[in-house]
Structures are given as C-alpha cells and as structure tokens.
Amino acid sequence: MQPTRILQGLKYRKLRLTTKDVNKGFYKGNRTGSMGTHTSYGTYKIDYTKVRTYVCPDLTGFKLTPFVSKTIRPVHDQFPGDKLGPKNPATYLARWKSENGLD
C-alpha cells in the first residue's frame, strides 16, 4: 500500500487539517496564541505583555449616536396593594391574557 500522490510530494503538516485528522492527536487550534505560561504547580501565570489591549479612540465630535437614548428612564410597574409585586403569578397571567388574547 502506498500513500497518495499529495502525501508523497509534500509533508503532511503543510496540508490543511480536516475534521478527520483532529481525532488522531493533531491540535488544530484557533491561532490565538498563549497569554502566559503554565507553572510547575499547575497554575497559569498571565504575561501582561502578551495580553491584547484595545484603545478606544477619542469620540468627541463623533456623528453616530447609540441606538438607545441615554435620556430615557427605566419604567417600573406599580403594584399597589400587592405584597408579591411582579412575582405574583395571578398578575402575570392577567397581563398575559390581556396582551395575547388567547388562553
């Protein structure tokens, strides 16, 4: 039995790894690199010179705005005379029936 023509001419490592190769001990990885080292005590020490940091540019005078306005205040429902408040199952079912219509 002989290897295929591709494997005869090239080294196997130059070929792209497939899902069938992964189970045979090859680690494909996702090209992120290591952010530190493993110590002899079983812990991982982060090397902060390898950690990626992203600097946000100056946004003064930036023309795009966020999707949600910062001036809108959150609305809290009022439950007068109800001890459980929003946790009351009867209130939840009544609101669900009023909004959806069907039981």
Swiss-Prot record:
Alphabetized UniProt keyword annotations: Mitochondrion, Ribonucleoprotein, Ribosomal protein, Transit peptide
Gene Ontology biological-process annotations: translation
Principal subcellular localization: mitochondrion
One Pfam family of this chain: MRP-L27
GO cellular component, one term: mitochondrial large ribosomal subunit
Gene Ontology molecular functions: structural constituent of ribosome
Protein family (similarity comment): Belongs to the mitochondrion-specific ribosomal protein mL41 family.
Name of this protein: Large ribosomal subunit protein mL41
Species for this entry: Neurospora crassa (strain ATCC 24698 / 74-OR23-1A / CBS 708.71 / DSM 1257 / FGSC 987)
